[in-house]
């Protein structure tokens, strides 16, 4: 459960991510595909080369969806309900992939903001991304 302090840290640290959704999203997907090649199976129709139009467009969608969650921290599950349905019912994405994506996103954020991110901010972001992953798999039951 995110505390009020966690929520404030997440909102503040998310500003550069939300403003650069395509960059952060594309880098996160590139990192995930490199570190976890099995995740590529969900994107057979994509050009998965770093910086491709497909990765930039889908990466932006991912970050934009997470930005909506950041803007609605008191109802992340409700905010992501349709997205959870899509991934569970239609796309049938293995739930573990949300954790992999969350980890790669945290690494991407740290890579861009290394000196600025304090341990407590990293902890708050990690808690948020963990909760986000749980909310996305809620429709798998």
UniProtKB/Swiss-Prot annotation:
<dbReference type="GO" id="GO:0020037">
    <property type="term" value="F:heme binding"/>
</dbReference>
<dbReference type="GO" id="GO:0005344">
    <property type="term" value="F:oxygen carrier activity"/>
</dbReference>
<dbReference type="InterPro" id="IPR012292">
    <property type="entry name" value="Globin/Proto"/>
</dbReference>
<dbReference type="GO" id="GO:0019825">
    <property type="term" value="F:oxygen binding"/>
</dbReference>
<protein>
    <recommendedName>
        <fullName>Hemoglobin subunit alpha-1</fullName>
    </recommendedName>
</protein>
<comment type="subunit">
    <text>Heterotetramer of two alpha chains and two beta chains.</text>
</comment>
<dbReference type="Pfam" id="PF00042">
    <property type="entry name" value="Globin"/>
</dbReference>
<feature type="domain" description="Globin">
    <location>
        <begin position="1"/>
        <end position="141"/>
    </location>
</feature>
<dbReference type="InterPro" id="IPR009050">
    <property type="entry name" value="Globin-like_sf"/>
</dbReference>
<feature type="binding site" description="proximal binding residue">
    <location>
        <position position="87"/>
    </location>
    <ligand>
        <name>heme b</name>
    </ligand>
</feature>
<dbReference type="InterPro" id="IPR002339">
    <property type="entry name" value="Hemoglobin_pi"/>
</dbReference>
<feature type="binding site">
    <location>
        <position position="58"/>
    </location>
    <ligand>
        <name>O2</name>
    </ligand>
</feature>
<dbReference type="GO" id="GO:0042744">
    <property type="term" value="P:hydrogen peroxide catabolic process"/>
</dbReference>
<dbReference type="GO" id="GO:0031720">
    <property type="term" value="F:haptoglobin binding"/>
</dbReference>
<dbReference type="InterPro" id="IPR000971">
    <property type="entry name" value="Globin"/>
</dbReference>
<dbReference type="GO" id="GO:0005833">
    <property type="term" value="C:hemoglobin complex"/>
</dbReference>
<keyword id="KW-0813">Transport</keyword>
<dbReference type="GO" id="GO:0005506">
    <property type="term" value="F:iron ion binding"/>
</dbReference>
<dbReference type="GO" id="GO:0043177">
    <property type="term" value="F:organic acid binding"/>
</dbReference>
<dbReference type="GO" id="GO:0031838">
    <property type="term" value="C:haptoglobin-hemoglobin complex"/>
</dbReference>
<comment type="similarity">
    <text>Belongs to the globin family.</text>
</comment>
<comment type="function">
    <text>Involved in oxygen transport from the lung to the various peripheral tissues.</text>
</comment>
<keyword id="KW-0408">Iron</keyword>
<dbReference type="GO" id="GO:0004601">
    <property type="term" value="F:peroxidase activity"/>
</dbReference>
<keyword id="KW-0479">Metal-binding</keyword>
<keyword id="KW-0349">Heme</keyword>
<dbReference type="InterPro" id="IPR002338">
    <property type="entry name" value="Hemoglobin_a-typ"/>
</dbReference>
<dbReference type="GO" id="GO:0072562">
    <property type="term" value="C:blood microparticle"/>
</dbReference>
<keyword id="KW-0561">Oxygen transport</keyword>
<dbReference type="InterPro" id="IPR050056">
    <property type="entry name" value="Hemoglobin_oxygen_transport"/>
</dbReference>
């Amino acid at each position: 459960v995110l505390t009020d302090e966690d929520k404030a840290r997440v909102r503040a640290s998310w500003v550069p991510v939300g403003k650069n959704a395509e960059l952060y999203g594309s880098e996160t997907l590139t990192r995930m595909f490199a570190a976890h090649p099995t995740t590529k199976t969900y994107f057979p129709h994509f050009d998965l080369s770093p910086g491709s139009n497909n990765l930039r467009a889908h990466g932006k969608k991912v970050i934009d969806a997470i930005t909506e969650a950041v803007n609605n921290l008191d109802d992340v599950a409700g905010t992501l309900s349709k997205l959870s349905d899509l991934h569970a019912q239609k796309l049938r994405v293995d739930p573990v992939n949300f954790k992999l994506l969350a980890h790669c996103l945290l690494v991407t954020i740290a890579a861009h903001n290394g000196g600025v991110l304090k341990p407590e901010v990293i902890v708050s972001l990690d808690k948020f991304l963990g909760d986000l992953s749980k909310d996305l798999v809620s429709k798998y039951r």
